[in-house]
C-alpha cells in the first residue's frame, strides 16, 4: 500500500475573504444507497478538512426524502459527499438547483449520465472514445448470445451502482447467467462488457486539469469494493509506472471522457490498459470517494495539494462567476 498521507504537506488555511464569500457550508453525506458507509467516511473526512481550513462547515447525514434537505436551510451551499443513487445521479443536484442552493461537482445531466454506466458507454462510443465492447443484458436467456458476440472473460455489473458493488468476472455463459441474476437483484439494468486483461489506472481531475495518474494493483481478482475500501494489500503506484508520453495520453483520454459527459470541477476516470498498450475507458465518477483509502486525495497530494486545499478548491467553484475571493 502507498504510504501517502494527508499530513505531509504544510497546513492550508483558506483566505478570510474566501471564507466570508462561501458562508456556511453543509457537507451532505450518508444517504440511503448501497454506498452509505463509504459516504459517511468521505463526508466526515471532508468536513474535518473544511473546518481545519477555516471554513464554517457542518455535517448532514442525509436519509429519507431528499426534498426535505432544502426545507428552511441553515446553510449557504452544499459540498456533496453522497455516493451512489440519490446523491450522485442528478436527483439531489436537481433539488438543490431548483432551490437555488449552490453545490459542488457536476450538474444534473452530467451526474445522471455518469451514474448510468450503460449510457456513459453509448456516449463514449458515439464520440469515438475507446471503451470495451458491451451489451445491455435484460434476461438470463441472453447469456449464450452475449458470450458468442463478446467472447470471454466478461465483466458483469449493475448499471447504476458505484464502488464496484455487484461486479463479477465470468468465463462462461453459465457463469454469466448466474452473475446476471445477482446483478439484477441490485439494478433493473445490467451491463456486460469485455474484460480487459492488463493494468488498471485512475486519473483524478480538478478544475479541468488532470492530476498525476495512479496505477492500481491488488491480490483480489480485480479492484473491487473490498480492495477499494477495506483491504490493506492494495497497492497504489505514484508515479503510475507509465512512460511520460503514455501518462500524458492517459490524462488526455480522461479529460476527454470527463468533458464529453459535461462534468465539472472534479471527478475521477477509471481506465484499463490492454497487453498491446492501448487504453480503454471504464467509467467516470462524479463524486469519488474521499476516505483514507481514496484515490483523489492521493493524486492531489502527489501534485502538492493538501487534503484541506483540495476540498476548498472544489468548494470554491460553487461561487458565482466574477467573485474574486
UniProtKB/Swiss-Prot annotation:
Cofactor(s) essential for the protein: Mg(2+); Mn(2+)
Catalytic activity: 2 D-alanine + ATP = D-alanyl-D-alanine + ADP + phosphate + H(+)
HAMAP family listed in its UniProt record: Dala_Dala_lig (MF_00047)
Residues that, per the record, bind Mg(2+) 1: 270, 283
Localization per record: Cytoplasm
SUPFAM superfamilies listed in its UniProt record: Glutathione synthetase ATP-binding domain-like, PreATP-grasp domain
Keywords from the named record: ATP-binding, Cell shape, Cell wall biogenesis/degradation, Cytoplasm, Ligase, Magnesium, Manganese, Metal-binding, Nucleotide-binding, Peptidoglycan synthesis
Binding site for ATP: 147-202
GO CC annotation terms, alphabetical: cytosol
A Pfam family that the UniProt record links to this protein: Dala_Dala_lig_C
Cofactor binding, note field: Binds 2 magnesium or manganese ions per subunit.
Xref: Gene3D superfamilies: 3.40.50.20, ATP-grasp fold, A domain, ATP-grasp fold, B domain
UniProt-annotated binding residues for Mg(2+) 2: 283, 285
Function, in words: Cell wall formation.
Principal location listed in the UniProt entry: cytoplasm
Superkingdom: Bacteria
Enzyme Commission code: 6.3.2.4
MF terms in GO: ATP binding; D-alanine-D-alanine ligase activity; metal ion binding
InterPro entries on file: ATP-grasp, ATP_grasp_subdomain_1, D-Ala_lig_Van_CS, D_ala_D_ala, Dala_Dala_lig_C, Dala_Dala_lig_N, PreATP-grasp_dom_sf
Organism: Marinobacter nauticus (strain ATCC 700491 / DSM 11845 / VT8)
Pathway recorded for this protein: Cell wall biogenesis; peptidoglycan biosynthesis
Designated name of the protein: D-alanine--D-alanine ligase
Family per record: Belongs to the D-alanine--D-alanine ligase family.
Domain ATP-grasp: from-to ranges: 121-316
PROSITE patterns: ATP_GRASP, DALA_DALA_LIGASE_1
Lineage: Bacteria, Pseudomonadati, Pseudomonadota, Gammaproteobacteria, Pseudomonadales
